[in-house]
Amino acid sequence: MKKLILISALLFSFNGWADDTVIEHFSSEQTIKQNFPFSDAVRVDNTIYISGMIGEDDEGNLVEGGIVPEAHTVMKTMAKILAHFNLGYNDVFKCLVMIDDISEWSLFNSVYVQYFKKPYPARSAFGADGLAGNASFELECMARIQDDD
């Protein structure tokens, strides 16, 4: 019985070594330069997890003008991240929006629909006070790399 338990334990431990999960981290030059403690995106197999983004310019400053210019900046940043993985907006299947002032929801949506087309990704949202960098909103998304079948 002890031999059976030992053999089973060894087989399970070897199975962990055979894990062929693809994990790839992506950080932009801006993220590296600012020494943020996170990646802009992480690929795990065919899923891309995009970190929360705020409307910062290339120098790391929040763009001026409020939620509309911030949203355009975030969408352009997302396009660059998606392009790193040879993806586009149509590959995004889920987003989470954290918005500082929920009364600006329609302003955010007016920009969102310029980039995402029907059928839209699944989406959750909530009001949040005190977002990073004093941003009007933060957006995080997930995308899928299609199989080559």
Where are these regions (language model features)?
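Sec-dependent N-terminal signal peptides
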Residues: L4-S13
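N-terminal presequence-like segments and the immediate start of the first folded domain
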Residues: G16-K76, K80-N90, I99-D149
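Surface-exposed aromatic
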Residues: F93-C95
